[in-house]
Structures are given as structure tokens and as C-alpha cells.
Amino acid sequence: MLTKLLLPTPATAVVVILFFLSVPIGSGAWAAGLISLPGITFSKASRNFRLLSATGSGSLDDPFIVVEEVFGEGEVLLSINVYDADFGSRIETMHAVGFALQKVVINQTRKLWNHYALELEFDVGRGSDYYDGLSFGQKSKVNRPFRSDRFSWVEDLTEPRAVIRFTQGQVRPGESVRFTFAITHTQLTPKFYLVQHVLPPYAELDDDLNFPIKLAACCDKMDRLD
């Protein structure tokens, strides 16, 4: 008895691929570099990190927890898109959109991080200012003081750009760090970038993590030579 082998048509193959792309993994739908949760998506906008997971609902009791693995140099750009007009403020503020966010970042570089900064931008290179409606919970006490499990000093800035700077701590290669904060906006469906500056505020000799040269000290010595 002969059995006829049925090969999938191109149309069938496309349907199968689309099906697997639509299958949720964990609590969010996942594609390469993009994770979608109800009402919001998180996606890669730079090639120097891996977006590993995103969970939660964005409330104070159940914050979004985004896990990343940074392996390259330069700024880390995470794109955030609130696509549901009914998303609302999930942190009990008067903003059109608001959510609590925890970022877990794994240091897979060869550098010691003595400094970490988070900044909001509408477009890459165009920082969020005081009047554009995008902020780290501007004029709100939600989740404040912002905090980290590895940095003890936090600078919460609103002017001229929305920036949170974390210092007085360190994250060695292979270690992870957690940041807790909030993001708000006055529009219903904003799309923006969370920019992460991972370069420490000093120069290093070779790759020795024990002998940093602070830039402030270098500038002071140069001024004395003038």
C-alpha cells in the first residue's frame, strides 16, 4: 500500500509561523526583542543588550518587572509603547498613563558599574523636558524615593531633562542590579524610550577595577598646569 506524502503549501507554512509568533510565553507574548503585555509593549531599540522577560501589571502591588542583560558599550535603549487608550494610571495618580516599573539589569560586560542613570526620551537623542508630559512621576510621591538594591544614592532630576542617577555602589561583571521607580504621561497612548547610561563617571587604567581615576581629579590636575 502506497502512502501519499502531503507537503505543506507556502500559505500553510505562513499560517503556522504566524501561529507560533502569537503564542504567549509566560504572561506576555514574546518575539525577538519584543515583549507584549496587556496594553503595553517593551522592545529593544539598541543592539547592546538582551531583553529577557517582562511580567506584571504596572500597579504598585504588581509592578512591571523587566529583566535585561547588558553586554555591549554605549547607551541601552528600551522602547516602551502604551497602545491601549484604556491603559490609564495604574499607580493612583491623576496622569492619563502611569505605571510602576522595576528594572533588573545583569552586567555581562567586563566593566565595573559605579554609576547608572535612567533617562526618558521621546525620540532618540531628544530628552524629555519639564513641559512635554513625560516624566518619572513628576509632582507625585508614588514609589518615591526611587531606589536600587546596589546603589545607595539617588538623584531624582526633572530639569532640564527627566533623569534618575544612581551612585555610591557598584555592580561587578556577572552581577545584577534592581531599580524601582515610576513613569507617567499626560497622553493616553504614548510611545517613548527609556535610555540607560551604564558608563561610570570616571576613566580606568587598563581593565583593573581596583584603580579608577576620577575625571574630576584629572581636570583639577590639568587646571593646575595652565
Language model features: what each stretch is:
Residues K111-H115:
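Short acidic/proline- and small/hydrophobic-mixed sequence motifs that coincide with surface turns
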Residues I25, N107-T109:
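Short loop/turn positions at the edges of beta-strands in beta-sheet-rich folds
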